[in-house]
Amino acid sequence: MEVSSVKKLEQLEYSLESVTDLSSSSVSSSSPAVATFSYVDGVTELRFLQSDSTHCFNFDLASAQLFKLGPVHFICVSDGSSSSEEKSFSKGVNIKFKNEKDSKDFCESFEEWRNDSVVQGSSLQNGTVSANKSKFDNKIEASSAKMYFHYYGQLLHQQNMLQDYVRTGTYYAAVMENHSDFAGRVVVDVGAGSGILSMFAAQAGAKHVYAVEASEMAEYARKLIAGNPLFADRITVIKGKVEDIELPEKADILISEPMGTLLVNERMLESYVIARDRFMTPKGKMFPTVGRIHMAPFSDEFLFIEMANKAMFWQQQNYYGVDLTPLYGSAHQGYFSQPVVDAFDPRLLVASPMFHMIDFTQMKEEDFYEIDIPLKFTASMCTRMHGLACWFDVLFDGSTVQRWLTTAPGAPTTHWYQIRCVLSQPIYVMAGQEITGRLHLIAHSAQSYTIDLTLSAKMWGPGASQGGILQSSTCKFDLKEPYYRMSQPQAYPVAQEPPLQPQPELSTQQDIQTPNDELEEELLQQLPQNPSAQL
């Protein structure tokens, strides 16, 4: 049997200037102490023993965290509960070294022993993954988490977000305009990424900022922060998930950019409220504070034809001798299960929008697992309704200034754009007609949501009071798999120039069937003669 890498490490001891319990109210002792790394009964431990006391502080390195407060001053914290239930408290000690060399050597040993501890405890004897997973790991599939953290661990994607000047500029303004909320306060940056929000908080006068980042971007954040010495000593980068890590103190302010497409995509809002419950003081503030999902029905004939024609490829009866039509229905359903991400003209909306509010200071993590939104609109025009358009905004409720960050159509475009759920069966509506429905979001383990959308046009005129339904259309969408249309032309070409070169012999009518021209002509005839009536 192979000897564990932990067992191969020799027991190490370090002489310390002093060690004191964080929870102790007594004056710190100046008596010397000894720190010992050891492997006991299958567990890697770090023990602190004061020379004038028999009391020993024991830490399981699998859950221990080390924080640097100065050249020779550190804090070590760890889970203080031995139960398998959710961690509810932590224990910690103040550590002071005799010199910087001792502190550096200790930190290197701490990382080496802790990493080996994680490797040793990651699998069971039969090779299966340990059941001792974090809350995040229990609800998110490993492949999705790996791709997610890989994506956000790359600088090019961080640059994409930093260059969203609406996003970055609004955060900067919200922090600086409310500097009194940050000055002298402890701040936690949830999902810190490059660390830009942590540096905003430090510029606003934060006493200390804990930048928590689970991806490899944490290393870039350390490098970037170190290159800005004006506030580098007030920012500590912690690599890990907020569900797993421990902090040496409570936070007065939480700051984060947890919003995804449709506000909730990527399910980071759950981590945001978990950080609130674990780290924030009862009277702390959250930046952002609330979010709103805005919704309105829309009419866009060009988009509908574009999506319908994508599936027409599968209508070919002689594609290199193969009949593709058996898959047409599945292809059509697949295209219309993709939410469309793009920027659209707000004049395409056929009713005034409504919104659903999410209060980050009050929402529980479980409240994000299923979100049910009843819909009710009044059509403002006679047209064909093609689906539901959605966008979001968030509020930074500072003590001095309340500032909104919006992704609304017609406003400056952000990297979130807007999202539209297109019905495979559009509905005709008349001006003044009531539109009802339901937007039902169910979270899944791929860090996204399944969307069930139903829209109905209620009877109008004399029978409206009876509440009868004239038409109804339902579609299911996967928010994880959108159709990114940002670079696509917003108008569908209604005619094409004849080809300059003759087509290959296979491209004859009997070989490759063209889209149903009669259907396309019928759809295009629905376009209003006066463009302003539609837009």
From Swiss-Prot:
Domain SAM-dependent MTase PRMT-type, chain residue ranges per copy: 141-456
Catalytically driven reaction(s): L-arginyl-[protein] + 2 S-adenosyl-L-methionine = N(omega),N(omega)-dimethyl-L-arginyl-[protein] + 2 S-adenosyl-L-homocysteine + 2 H(+)
A Pfam entry, by short name: PrmA
Keyword Methyltransferase: yes
Ranges for region Disordered: 494-517
Biased composition (Polar residues): 507-516
PROSITE patterns: SAM_MT_PRMT
Protein name: Probable histone-arginine methyltransferase 1.3
Induction description: Targeted by PQT3 to degradation via 26S proteasome. Induced by proteasome inhibitor MG132 treatment (at protein level).
Molecular functions (GO terms): histone arginine N-methyltransferase activity; protein heterodimerization activity; protein homodimerization activity; protein-arginine omega-N asymmetric methyltransferase activity; protein-arginine omega-N monomethyltransferase activity
Regions that span the bilayer: none
PANTHER family: HISTONE-ARGININE METHYLTRANSFERASE CARMER-RELATED, PROTEIN ARGININE N-METHYLTRANSFERASE
GO biological process terms, semicolon-separated: epigenetic regulation of gene expression; peptidyl-arginine methylation, to asymmetrical-dimethyl arginine; positive regulation of DNA-templated transcription; positive regulation of response to oxidative stress; regulation of flower development; response to cadmium ion; response to salt stress; vegetative to reproductive phase transition of meristem
Primary localization: nucleus
Disruption phenotype: Increased sensitivity to paraquat-triggered oxidative stress. Slower root elongation after cadmium ion CdCl(2) treatment. Decreased histone H3 methylation (H3R17me2a) leading to reduced levels of APX1 and GPX1.
Quaternary context: Interacts with PQT3 in the nucleus.
Superkingdom, taxonomy of origin: Eukaryota
Residues with N-acetylmethionine modification: M1
Enzyme Commission number, as recorded: 2.1.1.319
